[in-house]
From Swiss-Prot:
<comment type="similarity">
    <text>Belongs to the phosphoglycerate mutase family. BPG-dependent PGAM subfamily.</text>
</comment>
<feature type="binding site">
    <location>
        <begin position="20"/>
        <end position="21"/>
    </location>
    <ligand>
        <name>substrate</name>
    </ligand>
</feature>
<dbReference type="InterPro" id="IPR001345">
    <property type="entry name" value="PG/BPGM_mutase_AS"/>
</dbReference>
<feature type="binding site">
    <location>
        <position position="97"/>
    </location>
    <ligand>
        <name>substrate</name>
    </ligand>
</feature>
<dbReference type="GO" id="GO:0006096">
    <property type="term" value="P:glycolytic process"/>
</dbReference>
<feature type="binding site">
    <location>
        <begin position="182"/>
        <end position="183"/>
    </location>
    <ligand>
        <name>substrate</name>
    </ligand>
</feature>
<feature type="binding site">
    <location>
        <position position="59"/>
    </location>
    <ligand>
        <name>substrate</name>
    </ligand>
</feature>
<comment type="function">
    <text>Catalyzes the interconversion of 2-phosphoglycerate and 3-phosphoglycerate.</text>
</comment>
<feature type="site" description="Transition state stabilizer">
    <location>
        <position position="181"/>
    </location>
</feature>
<keyword id="KW-0324">Glycolysis</keyword>
<keyword id="KW-0413">Isomerase</keyword>
<dbReference type="Pfam" id="PF00300">
    <property type="entry name" value="His_Phos_1"/>
</dbReference>
<feature type="active site" description="Tele-phosphohistidine intermediate">
    <location>
        <position position="8"/>
    </location>
</feature>
<dbReference type="GO" id="GO:0006094">
    <property type="term" value="P:gluconeogenesis"/>
</dbReference>
<feature type="binding site">
    <location>
        <begin position="86"/>
        <end position="89"/>
    </location>
    <ligand>
        <name>substrate</name>
    </ligand>
</feature>
<keyword id="KW-0312">Gluconeogenesis</keyword>
<protein>
    <recommendedName>
        <fullName>2,3-bisphosphoglycerate-dependent phosphoglycerate mutase</fullName>
        <ecNumber>5.4.2.11</ecNumber>
    </recommendedName>
</protein>
Length: 229
């Protein structure tokens, strides 16, 4: 069984080196090219899908659309869930990463970005950036909407969705592609591979490059590789 993961192509805020999180930004021109290239590589590799999953953020949705279009699979059903969203960067969202490092220190910012269990500064309740003000989240329990997340909290929302919704599809023999985000995919990879809390800090997933897992019957990886050529 194969599972394909794709981090969205470069976004406009990736290009500007800004913390993005749940803020909804579009793909950059380079990001569009990355997504289209990913779809072409998937087609060349002969990978076919029966069902697709993505977040409710534009950059991941568009990446998936380009991938399916370029691989001639636009008909594949797509499921969108906030549980596959990027990690919520709290009050850091919209800030420049370099300027934030200069203000708070590179070590502190590195902990906010990469530590498994260090939370970023949280959004204030009345902050206009709160996701509860966004129509796509208005049907959610307000207690489920974060004001900021670390990777641990991100994993705690991603893995139940994997277990309850995605994994059963794979066990039924359906071929799955997931287009999501750097940290929601890091959370899933941590779970699949059993990566330690310390080791996950070093894991980087490149934008727009398909990551293919070969899984056994227990959905444990027996092989993985990037379609980067």
């Amino acid at each position: 069984m194969k599972l394909v993961l794709i981090r969205h192509g470069q976004s406009e805020w990736n290009k500007l080196n800004l913390f993005t999180g749940w803020h909804d930004v579009d793909l950059s021109e380079e990001g569009v090219v990355e997504a289209m290239t990913a779809g072409k590589r998937i087609k060349e590799a002969g990978l076919e899908f029966d069902v697709a999953f993505t977040s409710v953020l534009t950059r991941a949705i568009k990446t998936l659309n380009y991938v399916l279009e370029e691989s001639d699979q636009m008909w594949v059903p797509v499921n969108k869930s906030w549980r596959l969203n990027e990690r919520h960067y709290g009050a850091l969202q919209g800030l420049n990463k370099q300027e934030t490092a200069e203000k708070y220190g590179a070590d502190q910012v590195q902990k906010w970005r990469r530590s498994y269990d260090t939370l970023p500064p949280l959004l204030e309740e009345n902050d206009e950036r709160q996701a509860k003000n966004d129509r796509r989240y208005q049907l959610l329990d307000t207690h489920a909407i974060p004001s900021g997340e670390n990777l641990k909290v991100t994993l705690e929302r991603v893995i139940p969705y994997w277990m309850d919704t995605i994994a059963p599809e794979i066990k039924e023999g359906r071929r799955v592609v997931i287009a999501a985000h750097g940290n929601s995919l890091r959370a899933l990879v941590k779970f699949l591979e059993g990566i330690s809390d310390d080791e996950i800090m070093e894991l980087e997933i490149p934008t727009g490059v398909p990551l293919v897992y070969e899984l056994n019957d227990d959905l444990k990886p027996v092989n993985k590789y990037y379609l980067d050529k």
